[in-house]
Structures are given as C-alpha cells and as structure tokens.
Amino acid sequence: MRKFPWSPVLPLLFLFLSTGLHVIEPTFVEQLRHRVFDEYQRLKPREYSNDIPVRILDIDDESLSRVGQWPWPRDVMAEVVARLNELGASAVVFDMVFSQPDRLSPKSLRKMLPKRPEFEAAREGLLQIPDNDELFAQTVDGAYVVTGFAMTGRETTEAAPAIKAGFAENGDRAAPYLPAYAGAMKVLSNIENKVAGNGALNAIPESDGVYRRIPMFMTLKDKIYPSLVAESL
C-alpha cells in the first residue's frame, strides 16, 4: 500500500492554519500576542538616551509649590512657552486641550465680583489688564507650538478643529481605513489660529484595556486629521 506524501502537504496545512488564526484571531491568540509583546518590553525596555532631542516638562510637586495649583493661568503658560523658545526648543507640544477660557483671566475674575458699588473700582481695574488667553495666543504665535484636541464619538455643533497641514494620498483613499469619530473638543479659536500645529490626543486601548499603540491619523466627518505625535514630527 502506497503511503500518502505528507511532506509537501504539511507546510500548506501549516500555512492555511496560520493564515486562518491571523484573520479570525481568537481571544487566546490575541491574549498570547499581548503577553509576548508586554514581556518583550519588560525584558528589554528602550533605554533612555540624552541624545534623543525630546524633553518632557513635568508638573511635579515642586512646580506646584512654586507656581501654585494646576491648571496654571495662561499668562504663566505664556511665560513657559517664551522661556522654552529662548532655550532653543524646536517645537513646544501641549498634550492638553485649551478648550475653555482661562478661569483666572481678568475678565473671568471680573464676572465673579459682586455687582456692588464698593467693587466697581476693582471691576474697572480688571478691564485694563490684558486677557490671559490673548497673551498666550500672542506668545505661541512667535514659537513653533503644537496644541491638542480630543476626538469624541458624539457629534458636536461647534466648528471642526483646524487642519494646519495638507495630506498627499497615493492610491486608494486612506480615510475608510482610519479610526473614525463624529465630533471633537477643540482648542479655543484665538489660540488655535496662532499655533503652528494641531493634532488629536486620542489613543485606542486593546481589548484588555492597555494602550499599546497610538493611531498616527484618524478621521472626523471623512476628513483626515493627524495625531499629536504625527503633527509634532
């Protein structure tokens, strides 16, 4: 009796099985992939190097004790940008959304004062002080500053975030294959108009809730937007 020639068939079976697991990706395969990836990061994490031209400005306890509670007024943030610009920063990137007017701006403080005669002089005096948001906008206009906005799954009535740079597409349209959102929490218009870059802060967690990847591009109403990382580069 002639034996079946398994030698040429086994590689094909292995190929079909591997392809099927990759396409279907059962839960156990996904979990295994995540564990292997995480173990790689623990065994050999990327070493810090002073040669990497990126610095993180961390708001720590010492900073809070010196300057005050967070969030800081926008006039203080303007001083931070100006100082970083003096130190030669190629770009200043904010991983936060300046979506609301500064609550410590003179005009905001003016609204908090009681409307009584004894406070009228203080109310008039606050009108003479420059607005914090305007000071910040003027400062970022003279530096390469990138701000962030947040994509949301809920449609909003406000204008879409500004796109600061165009995109060149080659071949099929990329938009259908990118993460899609219905709305966005954007930066104040007077600040957004002055910054050099504007990118999305969104990241998508894996099924286990861990963030391992950040999309470089995403869409809002079929328009392509860069992530904060892509815009900074």
Which role does the model predict for each range below?
Residues 2-233:
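Non-transmembrane functional regions of envelope-associated proteins
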